[in-house]
Design a protein with these regions (language model features):
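Long, hydrophobic/aromatic-enriched structural stretches that serve as scaffold segments
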Residues: 53-95
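Short acidic, hydrophobic short linear motifs in intrinsically disordered regions
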Residues: 208-219
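Charge-enriched amphipathic alpha-helical scaffolds
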Residues: 198-199, 220-244
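A conserved mid-domain beta-alpha-beta active-site/ligand-binding segment of alpha/beta enzyme cores
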Residues: 127-206
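Short, conserved secondary-structure transition motifs
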Residues: 113-131
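A short acidic (Asp/Glu
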Residues: 12-16, 32-33, 90-98, 121-126
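A structured, charge-rich N-terminal accessory region that forms the first stable segment of a protein
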Residues: 1-62
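A short alpha->loop->secondary-structure connector
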Residues: 97-110
Length: 244
């Protein structure tokens, strides 16, 4: 079996050996394309270098090569465990990965490892140690219908056709009902709704321009379904600060 984790913070909690890879992207912002290609990664690299001062060589080695190694290893394994949370940040990554697995013809058993229900939108964050047994307990096997649904979400996400965005307005299948606020949030982003900007403006008014830390904490507490880290929130904060 092979495991793919969403981020290094999760990797540090893993206390078992095996084929473990880390996905180090945040596809919820920046340029995207339906299919992974050299141009796809080139555009992503330019975005993170400009937006987050990332190092080009480190991005290639730690992000691109890591994911390519994962896909190569997957072809030799029958079972894949994808460790991703329910929030928008993680979900967009998950949709992309499932679409790429479909693209390479992966037909093995696909497991989505979800954080304990008790942690809510905080996901794996409160969990200190993760054992191999946890990977079994928290895993949900994705049947072909579920895989197809997530693949459709990815293609809707990258589409520029507003008709495709209708998927984000529909209720998700029952096993994934928790995705409803996540899909609503993405629908609002796609359709130009100012809700997210209004949320940031409200936090600016409450905490002031120097209140980034308490504002970020409040945002995570009340709107955890976005799943944004401090870097993503800082970009939003600075953008609204420049206007206000």
């Amino acid at each position: 079996m092979v495991h793919l984790l969403n981020g290094d913070a999760l990797y540090e909690k893993i206390h078992f050996a095996g084929a473990i890879y880390v996905f180090r992207e945040a596809l919820c912002e920046g340029p995207v394309q339906p299919v992974m290609s050299e141009d796809f990664w080139s555009r992503r690299q330019s975005f993170v270098m400009t937006g987050y001062s990332a190092n080009a060589q480190e991005y290639t080695e730690n992000t691109v090569r890591e994911f390519e190694s994962f896909l190569s290893d997957v072809s030799k394994k029958q079972t894949v465990f994808l460790w991703f949370e329910w929030d928008l940040f993680c979900q967009v990554n998950l949709w992309f990965i499932i679409a790429q697995l479909r693209r390479i013809g992966y037909s093995g058993e696909l497991h989505w490892v979800q954080p304990p229900e008790a942690t809510g939108w905080r996901g794996f964050g409160p969990v200190e140690i993760i054992t191999y047994q946890d990977s079994i307990t928290w895993a949900q096997v994705l049947d072909p219908e579920s895989v197809n649904y997530f693949q459709k979400l990815w293609y809707a996400y990258v589409s520029t056709d507003a008709a495709d965005w209708d998927l984000f307005s529909q209720d998700p299948p029952e096993p994934f009902s928790k995705l409803k606020p996540v899909l609503n949030a993405e629908r609002d982003r796609k359709t130009g709704c100012m809700k997210l900007h209004q949320l940031i403006d409200g936090l600016l008014n409450k905490h002031g321009k120097d209140g980034f830390i308490p504002a970020f904490r409040a945002f995570c507490k009340d709107h955890g379904y976005y799943g944004f880290g401090d870097l993503q929130f800082k970009r939003l904060w600075d953008g609204r600060l420049a206007i206000n």
